[in-house]
């Protein structure tokens, strides 16, 4: 079965964005499969890369039609943006009304990119493959839900956000703010010290005072 899946997937792992962090590559390596014995179909070859989305990229040349992105969009986010169109060798992932990804009704939660086993759908921050110094478990501060996040740190700055699947609060899911709006963490206008109003003016205070 894995060999058949690989007939429709480029065997160019070394140049792939998610090299060494690809579920398909991991399964193939575990089974000792580095090539396939079948003629390669052409249903996913030569499809233009869709870079119209602000946060995600769609590269259907690397899609294996597993359908996980469709289920994540439907069952986790409830947006129903992605679907499997066509039949047989003509099957492929499309957005609503076959629009460009950036023109679709996508709410940018990133669930599709997070669950994709290859880099058919990935985000612009390369959250699945970024070379980082460390990863730190934290809690999103945008709202009161308290989604558990994993921040990828490089040179003391957050460069990507992941959502661990085993977390109880959000079970590996979050919204656009939690996943992609992390630039505010280092924004110069962000309040990092408690303020107390004294004599009509806000003054910095200690955490104990606050």
Task: Please report, for each region that a protein language model flagged, where it lies by residue.
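N-terminal export/assembly segments and adjacent metallocofactor-ligating motifs
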Residues: 2-8, 17-210
